[in-house]
């Protein structure tokens, strides 16, 4: 079996072997012939060889080596898409043509061409081995990488329960794109208080935060009740034991403790003395506080958790964002906090104010109080922030549908007013002007025309169709040829003639039969005088396996055309308009699709095709009738 190698216009510069006119695929000494033989065998013999030569866009993604080459198989002058079963057409004596396509054309018809990527000819054997090994191991590797549903569920649950952090020491909160409430609030903050912007100076800070987050949430959920003053020191030791302190924050806390307690300013230089001064300050504050002692104690425990270490501030801020609070639940407290940490304040925010920093986005607040985090009544699932009960009047309609409710009421009022106008005898013009005035600028732009009336264009089109049907019937009755003055017949048709039932028109049209214009004479295929039977200009009808004009896929179809040139072996025919290919042109007027072989553009545009007499069947000669 021979394989011709050719190239489409314009020529594609592909390796030296592409200039070979034909290759004998039975010669195994040639590496190129061996490779092409394996390609043909893979596509024609039921995937016996299992080589990794694929077709289409999926195969383009699988190759990364060598130059890209688009090939197309052709037999008897027409292209064969790879999706066909080529075993029906291949024989030992067949000659296939392997056409090299340009890249743009190959990408346009990626499902119909072979895609080949080659390195230098010396590495073809190695490439074949690599392709085959990758193809055999691709499915096995995919099965190993797939996760079971149980494993995926566990990973999903673990990802939701724990905060995520990256390997580059950048903390990522649960709420990704949450806008900050004010940039000025964070402008004067210390370096350690900057959220999600600075890298940590401690290498294992991520692991420490990860552990502290779980331990603090667990501890706060178990101790949601009131924390007394005696248990305050235990709570401080439990949280500070799992969190690493940073020296810059300790210096900040010691400076604040100096201002609050001057008697203990000398002993606040070290880390231990700072914690003692903070605890003593908090205990003195709790003794002198007025009002409810339980709420003050809970507030002191939260502020003590913040002042004892620096990491707990970021932990409480980020972990509180995992919860979604209903809008308006803590409205009074949030208003008080906004007044405390206003953007116009010249002094930097204190540690206690930082613990209540929140975003402007509703229902996404930061709380460090354990009572607020563990409250069952305030915990709401995501997507359910709006928990306000709808009113009884509009309980069936949500807020986004308020416009539709108003439009419905407006529509009902308009209909009611139109009925009243009918009863009072208002003219149609007045009603139309009234409706236009009411619906002018309306959102929905409701049309008040009743269904079935149609526009003036629709009525005119229906009238033209009726006139055309009547004209055909008049032409059939008179048996006259159409002339230019017969156009007046349509205009002079009375209106009563146009108002007949459509059933009569359809019955009369069903009886119409177009008389054949040509008489076909079959021509025997055994005769060798085709060039004498079909002179130039004669009409012929034949059956051939050619490309579909629309889908460009091979099919057996009947075609009709006029003979342009004829010889003993081939015939050149100008096909009818319905049998020509649907060509596409670029901005320069050149054909960009459906180019096969070396057919010139002039013949493609004119619909001229060349066939061998041996490929035609059911050949008929057409002659005009008298």
Curated annotation (Swiss-Prot):
Per the record, what phenotype accompanies loss of this gene's function? Leads to abnormal trimethylation of U snRNAs, and defects in pre-mRNA splicing including of genes involved in quiescence, and abnormal Cajal body integrity. Leads to an increase in cnp3/CENP-C protein, lagging chromosomes and abnormal mitotic and meiotic chromosome segregation. Leads to an increase in the RNA level of genes involved in meiosis and rRNA, and a decrease in the RNA level of genes involved in cytoplasmic translation. Decreases mating and sporulation efficiency.
The domain of life is: Eukaryota
- The PTM Phosphoserine maps to 148, 162
Give me the ranges of the annotated region Disordered.
253-309, 382-433
Q: Where is the composition biased (Basic and acidic residues)?
A: 382-395
Can you say where in the cell this protein is located?
Cytoplasm; Nucleus, Cajal body
Subunit: Interacts with tgs1; both proteins are required to maintain Cajal body integrity. Interacts with U2 and U5 snRNAs.
Any Gene Ontology CC annotation? Cajal body
Name the family: Belongs to the coilin family.
Task: Name it.
Answer: Coilin
Q: What exactly does this protein do? A: Component of nuclear coiled bodies, also known as Cajal bodies or CBs, which are involved in the modification and assembly of nucleoplasmic snRNPs. Required for proper pre-mRNA splicing.
Primary location: cytoplasm
- Record GO terms (molecular function): RNA binding
The UniProt record lists the keyword Protease: no
Ranges of biased composition (kind: Polar residues):
396-417
């Amino acid at each position: 079996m021979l394989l011709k190698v050719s190239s489409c216009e314009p020529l594609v510069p592909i390796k030296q072997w592409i200039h070979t006119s034909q290759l004998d695929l039975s010669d195994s000494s040639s590496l190129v012939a061996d490779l092409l033989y394996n390609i043909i065998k893979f596509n024609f013999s039921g995937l016996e060889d299992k080589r990794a030569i694929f077709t289409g866009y999926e195969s383009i993604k699988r190759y990364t080596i060598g130059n890209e080459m688009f090939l197309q198989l052709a037999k008897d002058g027409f292209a064969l898409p790879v999706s066909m079963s080529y075993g029906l057409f291949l024989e030992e004596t067949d000659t296939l043509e392997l056409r090299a396509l340009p890249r743009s054309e190959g990408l346009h018809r990626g499902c119909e061409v072979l895609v080949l990527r080659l390195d230098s000819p010396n590495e073809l054997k190695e490439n074949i081995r690599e392709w085959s090994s990758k193809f055999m191991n691709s499915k096995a590797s995919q099965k190993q990488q797939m996760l079971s549903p149980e494993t995926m569920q566990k990973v999903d649950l673990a990802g939701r329960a724990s905060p995520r952090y990256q390997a580059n020491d950048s903390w990522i909160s649960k709420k990704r794109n949450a806008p900050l409430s004010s940039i000025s609030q964070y402008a004067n903050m210390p370096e350690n208080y900057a959220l999600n912007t600075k890298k940590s100076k401690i290498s294992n800070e991520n692991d420490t935060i990860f552990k502290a987050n779980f331990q603090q949430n667990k501890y706060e959920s178990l101790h949601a009740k009131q924390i007394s003053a005696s248990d305050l020191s235990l709570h401080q030791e439990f949280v500070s034991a799992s969190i690493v302190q940073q020296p810059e924050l300790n210096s900040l806390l010691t400076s604040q403790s100096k201002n609050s307690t001057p008697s203990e300013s000398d002993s606040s230089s070290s880390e231990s003395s700072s914690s003692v001064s903070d605890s003593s300050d908090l205990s003195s504050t709790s003794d002198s506080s007025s009002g409810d002692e339980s709420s003050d104690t809970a507030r002191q425990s939260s502020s003590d958790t913040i002042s004892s270490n620096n990491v707990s501030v970021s932990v409480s801020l980020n972990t509180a964002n995992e919860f979604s609070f209903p809008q308006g639940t803590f409205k009074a407290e949030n208003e008080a906090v906004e007044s405390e940490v206003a953007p116009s304040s010249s002094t930097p925010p204190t540690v206690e104010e930082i613990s209540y920093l929140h975003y402007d986005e509703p229902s996404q607040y930061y709380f460090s109080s354990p009572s607020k985090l563990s409250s069952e009544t305030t915990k709401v699932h995501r997507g359910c922030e709006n928990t306000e009960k709808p009113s009884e009047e509009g309980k069936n309609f949500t807020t986004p549908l308020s416009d539709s409710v108003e439009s419905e009421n407006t529509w009902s009022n308009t209909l009611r007013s139109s009925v009243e106008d009918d009863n009072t005898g208002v003219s149609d013009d007045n009603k139309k002007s009234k409706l236009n005035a009411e619906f002018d600028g309306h959102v929905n732009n409701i049309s008040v025309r009743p269904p079935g009336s149609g526009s003036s264009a629709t009525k005119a089109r229906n009238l033209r169709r009726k006139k055309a049907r009547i004209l055909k019937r008049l032409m059939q009755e008179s048996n006259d040829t159409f002339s230019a003055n017969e156009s007046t017949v349509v205009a002079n048709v009375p209106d009563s003639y146009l108002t007949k039932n459509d059933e009569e028109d359809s019955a009369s049209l069903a009886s119409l039969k177009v008389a054949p214009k040509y008489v076909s004479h079959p021509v025997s295929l055994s005769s060798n005088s085709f060039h004498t039977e079909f002179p130039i200009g004669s009409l012929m009808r034949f059956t051939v396996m050619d490309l579909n004009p629309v889908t460009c896929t091979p099919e057996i179809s009947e075609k009709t055309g006029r003979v342009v040139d004829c010889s003993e072996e081939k015939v050149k025919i100008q096909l009818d308009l319905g049998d020509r290919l649907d060509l596409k042109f670029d901005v320069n007027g050149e054909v960009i699709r459906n180019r096969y072989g070396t057919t010139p553009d002039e013949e493609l545009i004119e619909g001229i095709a060349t066939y061998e007499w041996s490929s035609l069947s059911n050949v008929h000669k057409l002659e005009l009738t008298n």
